[in-house]
């Protein structure tokens, strides 16, 4: 679920898009309480209002008191299945209420200027969408790659200035990079494509950017979970068009909570090791004359364990 969808509807009901000062007042006076509660729950409403006010105030300082949009993209958790997406298998995943939010002002200069709390990002000129080896593993590469993915599919892109804040921990296993990719894709969709690009398409473009421009091998699970939102079952047997089924399920209704523990570690510098996983899994599949592991049975795998270890 993305706040932008709800916020645009609310603003349209008012008849116009609002400047940042007016959005701040709307947050303070409770006019967005229903939308924020839908995203984060009633117990988090007060803290989220403080968070949004702080982000909006900083955005006003950096971007000016201009007409703006707010976007949100969530992190994700794997409920069932890990490293099964790139093996054309199945997985159950869910978005979480930790997200990256951004205040965005459209521009006509074809440049993306992205300010983020805690780190700096160089402006990205969308006139140049070539792969840049020097940008490997950078935020700039993801922005450029998503813009390239949009144009390859015949969609429009354009410039914008943004200030963002994220509580999806980087390197914490919640897919902060996929959340960012979905955020950028959603911004391009809403600002320049009348919000007509599907969640699934945005996810695919995000994966393309991560694989080709960020240069990290990954399946489609992370982007799809962040983009589709809520609980979802995914079957990747059809590589180009995976089957995604939303599941109407709230763990709290059954007495369950998902607890995330910050163990003060990160896999942010392990991109090469992560990229090796699908290659190693496909190497095992090749021993059976198959492309991916979903094409062999569990019994075949167990019967040949010694051979696999030897190889």
Regions found by a protein language model. Give the residues of each.
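Glycine/serine-rich anion-binding loops at beta->alpha junctions
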Residues: 73-88, 167-183
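Structural signature of FAD isoalloxazine-binding scaffolds in flavoprotein oxidoreductases
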Residues: 88-108, 228
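Beta-strand segments within the central parallel beta-sheet cores of soluble alpha/beta enzyme folds
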Residues: 113-115, 159-166, 196-208
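Helix-rich "cap/lid" substructures immediately adjacent to catalytic or cofactor-binding pockets
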Residues: 134-168, 298
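Fold-level recognition of mixed alpha/beta catalytic cores in primary-metabolism enzymes, strongest
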Residues: 172-258
């Amino acid at each position: 679920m993305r706040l932008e969808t709800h916020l645009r509807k609310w603003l349209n009901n008012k008849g116009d898009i609002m400047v940042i000062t007016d959005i701040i007042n709307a947050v303070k006076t409770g006019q967005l309480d229903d939308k924020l509660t839908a995203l984060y729950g009633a117990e988090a409403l007060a803290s989220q209002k403080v968070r949004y006010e702080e982000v909006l105030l900083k955005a006003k300082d950096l971007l000016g008191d201009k007409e703006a949009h707010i976007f949100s993209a969530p992190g994700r958790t794997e409920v069932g299945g890990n490293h099964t997406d790139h093996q054309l298998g199945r997985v159950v995943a869910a978005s979480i209420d930790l997200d990256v939010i951004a205040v965005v002002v459209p521009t006509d200069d074809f440049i993306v200027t992205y300010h983020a709390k805690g780190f700096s990002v160089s402006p990205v000129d969308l006139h140049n969408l070539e792969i840049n080896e020097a940008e490997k593993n950078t935020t700039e590469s993801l922005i450029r790659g998503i813009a390239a993915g949009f144009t390859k599919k015949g969609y429009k892109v354009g410039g914008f200035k943004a200030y963002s804040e994220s509580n999806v921990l980087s390197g914490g296993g919640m897919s902060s990079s996929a959340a960012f990719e979905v955020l950028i894709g959603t911004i391009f969709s809403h600002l320049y494509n009348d919000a007509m690009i599907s969640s699934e398409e945005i996810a695919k473009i995000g994966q393309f950017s991560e694989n080709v421009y960020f240069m990290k091998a990954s399946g489609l699970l992370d982007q799809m979970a962040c983009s589709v939102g809520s609980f979802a079952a995914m079957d990747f047997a059809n590589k180009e068009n995976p089957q995604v089924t939303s599941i109407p399920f709230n763990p709290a209704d059954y007495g369950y909570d998902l607890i995330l523990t910050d163990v003060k570690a990160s896999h942010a510098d392990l991109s090469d090791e992560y990229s090796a996983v699908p290659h190693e899994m496909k190497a095992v599949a090749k021993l059976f004359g198959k492309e991916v592991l979903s094409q062999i049975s569990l019994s075949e795998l167990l019967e040949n364990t010694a051979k696999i270890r030897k190889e």
